[in-house]
Amino acid sequence: MILVDLEFPVSGQIYQFRLDECMTVNLAIDEVLSIIAQKERSNFSEDKEKWMLCSKTGRKILTRTMSLKEQGIRTADSLILV
């Protein structure tokens, strides 16, 4: 498990998430959108394919079919979901 900061510009918030580093980016996007939607009482999960998870630390767009670990994401990294 890794602990990351996730910026979500749609709500203007930064959240801390504990994620399994072996999960794919697709699964991570699904999980964080579901949690944020519950917290914000909104539905951000429509058209999930349009969302991109990016590493602010590594300055790159993460590949949806690869795991967080495969892309070098570690504890204390900063991510942004746009």
What are these regions (language model features)?
Residues 1-82:
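Ubiquitin system architectures
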